């Protein structure tokens, strides 16, 4: 019985907190490495098998069976052809391993010293694997660590059991300062493997999820799933918004999160360096949710554009600065929380904007439908915004517009349908036409400009070069300076050719 091996396995397993199987594997690998050094060849493959009950061990030299070949073997000290192998055992197949018992090295002081580095490496790998297994399950949770080292770029946290977490400077709340041995909470957002440093536990104190997890601790109703956090947005260290809802009508979700005399929300705020937190009532109606999220500003009116996923919000002029917030903070957080692009303006600006847009729509109706201003205005006042709505709404809805009878409604729908059909045919024809590469690569050219040019039969750089500024402004929306620059860019190769001919 080799008691030395068993004693080393027991002590290292207890000291490192690693299973005995891992230590046995490490010692086997170490003994195999020491045994291999007895051979003159560099790539001899040795396997050592330790009896985990007695500590006795055996050593074997190994060859892998490969296909017969006329060429020399890639690893002659580790491989044997199938023909050679079957001279030893006729049942062997490609991929099998032939083992030959060899004399084992003694597990003495010299062998221990030679094997030490291998054992340490194996144990370190096992510890790293253990850390990854332990913390992979905790991604998305709060963790607590002790500040071990502070640098300009990051803070290293001691998580215990040889585990360390990395808190990068950009994941720290501004103006936050920690000292060695300070305890702090953070949100574990990733576990990754670094070849040099081992497992990297990446934590954050700035992410919205950190705020959410803190509320889960302070508000038991969230853990009990009586209250649900639907979203959060933060300007770390300054301000945050969090949206909550409940399916239990008897509970006030905002009041529960605020707590008695603000105790719950204050506890969260203190952890975040005094971050001001707005608790918003969630609503499945996006417009109502935005109204709630804009608090403390009161929304006077709101216009939703689902196509562009934007909302125009009008507030009283006196509340405009409050609605926007310092450096746009309030509207930015509301936008992040709701997922909508928000445009905040005064009621007068909203009216002016909508009047301008209504004017454009009215002009489009007059041109496309060939109607007078009165009919176009009636369509706009009734809420029709484009030709598709005119063409495809139920005829009863169109007849409900003041001054429209059945004949007028039918004629408007016919005209709108004809225009849309013509546009679709033109679009298909346009798809078949493609701008030349020399047109697309001109300085100042955009995809939208190229599309408009192609619509007007300007397909190449030379087509554009022949246009004047006035010609260009008549076919696309562009100012004088931009038009001149674009035309000069298109003509540049003409001048280059002239210079080349002169020289």
Swiss-Prot record:
Residues 308-374 form the KH domain. GO terms for cellular component: cytosol. InterPro entries: DNA_repair_Rad51/TF_NusA_a-hlx, KH_dom, KH_dom-like_a/b, KH_dom_NusA-like, KH_sf_prok-type, NA-bd_OB-fold, NusA_bac, NusA_N_sf. The keyword Transcription regulation applies. Residues 140-206 form the S1 motif domain. It is found in: Cytoplasm. GO terms for molecular function: DNA-binding transcription factor activity; nucleotide binding; RNA binding. It comes from the Bacteria. GO terms for biological process: DNA-templated transcription termination; transcription antitermination. Keywords: Cytoplasm, RNA-binding, Transcription, Transcription antitermination, Transcription regulation, Transcription termination. SUPFAM superfamilies: Nucleic acid-binding proteins, Prokaryotic type KH domain (KH-domain type II), Rad51 N-terminal domain-like, Transcription factor NusA, N-terminal domain. Pfam families: HHH_5, KH_5, NusA_N. Belongs to the NusA family. Monomer. Binds directly to the core enzyme of the DNA-dependent RNA polymerase and to nascent RNA. Participates in both transcription termination and antitermination. PANTHER family: TRANSCRIPTION TERMINATION FACTOR NUSA, TRANSCRIPTION TERMINATION_ANTITERMINATION PROTEIN NUSA. This is Transcription termination/antitermination protein NusA. It comes from Coxiella burnetii (strain RSA 493 / Nine Mile phase I).
């Amino acid at each position: 019985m080799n008691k030395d091996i068993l004693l080393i396995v027991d002590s290292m397993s207890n000291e490192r907190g690693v299973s005995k199987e891992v230590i046995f594997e490490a010692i086997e690998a170490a003994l195999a490495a020491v045994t291999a050094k007895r051979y003159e060849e560099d790539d001899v493959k040795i396997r050592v098998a330790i009896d985990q009950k007695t500590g006795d061990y055996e050593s074997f030299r190994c060859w892998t069976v490969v296909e017969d070949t006329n060429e020399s073997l890639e690893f002659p000290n580790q491989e044997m052809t199938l023909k050679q192998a079957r001279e030893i055992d006729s049942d062997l197949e490609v991929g099998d391993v032939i083992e030959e018992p060899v004399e084992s090295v003694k597990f003495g002081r010299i062998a221990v010293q030679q094997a030490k580095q291998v054992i340490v490496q194996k144990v370190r790998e096992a510890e790293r694997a253990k850390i990854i297994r332990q913390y992979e399950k905790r991604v998305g949770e709060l963790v607590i660590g002790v500040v071990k080292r502070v640098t300009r770029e990051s803070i290293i946290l001691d998580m215990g059991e040889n585990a360390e977490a990395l808190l990068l400077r950009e994941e720290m709340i501004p103006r936050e300062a920690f000292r060695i041995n300070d305890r702090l909470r953070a949100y574990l957002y990733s576990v990754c493997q670094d070849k040099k440093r081992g497992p990297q536990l990446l934590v954050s104190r700035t992410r919205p999820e950190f705020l959410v997890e803190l509320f889960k601790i302070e508000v038991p109703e969230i853990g009990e799933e009586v209250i649900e956090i639907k979203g959060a947005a933060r300007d770390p260290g300054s301000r945050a918004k969090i949206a909550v809802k409940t399916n239990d009508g008897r509970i006030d979700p905002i009041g529960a999160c605020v707590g008695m005399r603000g105790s719950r929300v204050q506890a969260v705020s203190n952890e975040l360096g005094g971050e001001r937190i707005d608790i918003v009532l969630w609503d499945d109606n996006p417009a109502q949710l935005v109204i709630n999220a804009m608090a403390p500003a009161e929304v006077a009116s709101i216009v939703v554009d689902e196509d562009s996923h934007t909302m125009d919000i009008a507030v009283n002029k006196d509340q405009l600065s409050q609605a926007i917030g310092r450096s746009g903070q309030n509207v930015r957080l509301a936008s992040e929380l709701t997922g909508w692009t928000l445009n905040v303006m005064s009621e007068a600006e909203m009216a002016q904007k909508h009047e301008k847009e209504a004017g454009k729509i009215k002009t489009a109706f007059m041109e496309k439908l060939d109607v007078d201003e009165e009919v176009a205005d009636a369509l706009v006042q009734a809420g029709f915004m484009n030709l598709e709505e005119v063409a495809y709404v139920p005829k009863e809805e169109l007849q409900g517009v003041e001054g429209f009878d059945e004949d007028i409604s039918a004629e408007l729908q016919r005209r709108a349908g004809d225009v849309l059909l013509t546009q679709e045919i033109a679009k298909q024809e346009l798809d078949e036409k493609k701008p030349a590469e020399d047109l697309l690569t001109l300085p100042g050219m955009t995809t939208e400009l190229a599309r408009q040019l192609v619509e007007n039969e300007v397909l190449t750089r030379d087509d554009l070069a022949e246009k004047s500024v006035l010609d260009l402004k008549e076919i696309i929306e562009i100012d004088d300076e931009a038009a001149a620059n674009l035309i000069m860019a298109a003509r540049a190769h003409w001048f280059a050719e002239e210079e080349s001919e002169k020289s």
